[in-house]
Amino acid sequence: FLLQDYAEKNPELVKRMIDEGHIVGNHSVHHYSMPTLGQAECESEIKDFHKYMEDNYDYTMTVFRPPMGEFSEFSLGVTANCGYETELWSFAYADWAVNNQPDEGQALEKLVNAAHPGAIYLLHSVSKTNTDILGDFIDRVRAGGFEFG
C-alpha cells in the first residue's frame, strides 16, 4: 500500500512491483484520517492517486487501506463507491519511528509468531529493522508451512 508521494519519489521500485506481479494498493494521497474528511475530500484522496497510477504506470489499483486504519461507515461507503475494496491487517507493531526502531531479534520473533493462514502484515518501508530481518522472516514463515500470496 503506497502513498502518492512514495510512488512519485520511487518510480523504479513501483514499476518493479508491478512488473513482478505484486498488488499495489492505494493508501491515499496525503495520509489523512478518512473519517475526518467530507465526501469530496475522501473521494479526492482515493481518486487522485488512482488517476496518478493509471496515468504514470498504466496500473489500476483496486484495494485501499485507510491511513492509520481509521475508518467509519461513511468512509467505507465512499471507498466502495470509488470501486475499491478496503483491506486492513491482522498484525502490526511499532515499526514506523525511524529513531526508535524495535530490536531485530524481538521483532523477528513477533512477526514469525503472528503467522497464521490469511495473515496480513503491516510493515512500514521506513523501518530499518524490517529491512534487516525481512529475508529471515520470509524464510522462517515459509519453513513453517506458510506461503505468501
Feature annotation, model-predicted:
Residues 70, 75-114, 146-149:
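His/Asp/Glu-enriched short active-site or ligand-binding loop at hydrolase and phosphoryl-transfer sites
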